A protein has these predicted regions:
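Conserved active-site alpha-helix within GNAT-family acetyltransferase domains
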Residues: 196, 208-210, 219-236
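Conserved beta-hairpin
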Residues: 80-100, 184-186
């Protein structure tokens, strides 16, 4: 799959080779990839204003900080609506990762869930609960999380709930969608077209399903998504935007070819 100038899916042509001289492999992630996916995410966001606010003690308790990222990656992978992908160098090193969720109660969403199979869904359900319990017990044994500013985490979670309802929950027409939960790429590999290749995976799926893609863009990531044809629905809540980068970053949406857009983009 390749993308046209306006970011629409062009399924008739193959993607161009990355400008990097080293071949990059995009493949479906496995549960064994979760630790390295988490470490990549933790490294990418380590010095951002938001991370500094949420995890001010991450340097002193780096192992706990890293575990947050690993646990989140694995928890998402144990949801049957999730699809996770990694970008690997020719040596097999994971240099980037993306996680997407197929949301909604439409026929396409349920078809995908059924295709996973009953046994696998049961395994994922049991594994998710076991993993949740394991994480709770481990944090308790360690005396709780020492990396976080708990008040900041609770405040940020409340902002996320407000924005989630404002841009997604209150819009029935946006319920059926692919949602980009995470896209991370090691700094030394950025600017080489790898992020575009990872996003092409979900854009092809959304084009095939005839549904939109939604995501929360960081200040730095907004440029990439704009180039891919995403449109800005609105900035994060004022406080969240200020923490991120002077009001930059926000909720973005992508429409597949032939999709009838909403009559109004009002938030």
């Amino acid at each position: 799959m390749s993308l046209t100038a306006n970011g629409k899916a062009n399924l008739a042509t193959s993607p161009k080779t990355s400008i990097s001289s080293e071949p990059i492999i995009i493949r479906r992630a496995t549960l064994k990839d979760a630790p390295e996916m988490g470490r990549v995410g933790g490294r990418v966001y380590y010095d951002t204003p938001l991370t500094s606010w949420l995890w001010p003690h991450r340097a002193k308790y780096h192992a706990q900080y890293e575990r947050h990222w690993i646990e989140r990656r694995l928890a998402l992978m144990l949801n049957p609506r999730n699809e996770s992908y990694v970008a690997c160098s020719s040596s097999g090193q994971i240099i980037g990762a993306a996680q997407f969720a197929r949301l909604g109660d439409d026929a396409g969403a349920w078809k995908r869930i059924r295709e996973i199979g009953v046994l696998r869904r049961v395994f994922m359900w049991v594994a998710a609960w076991v993993f949740w319990g394991y994480c709770k017990v481990r944090w308790w044994l360690e005396g709780g999380d020492k990396t976080q500013n708990k008040e900041a985490v609770e405040t940020f979670a409340s902002w996320c709930r407000v924005d989630g309802e404002r841009y997604w929950g209150s819009h029935e027409e946006r319920a059926s969608r692919w949602h980009c939960q995470s896209l991370v790429l090691l700094p030394e590999w950025q600017g080489k077209g790898i992020g575009k290749k990872l996003m092409a995976v979900v854009m092809e799926k959304a084009q095939r399903d005839g549904v939109i893609i939604g995501l929360e863009a960081s200040a730095k990531g907004e440029g990439l998504y704009t180039k891919l044809g995403f449109e800005l629905l609105g900035r994060f809540t004022g406080e969240a935007g200020a923490v991120e980068d002077v009001g930059q970053g926000g909720m973005m949406i992508w429409y597949p070819e032939g999709y009838k857009k909403e009559a109004s983009s009002e938030m």
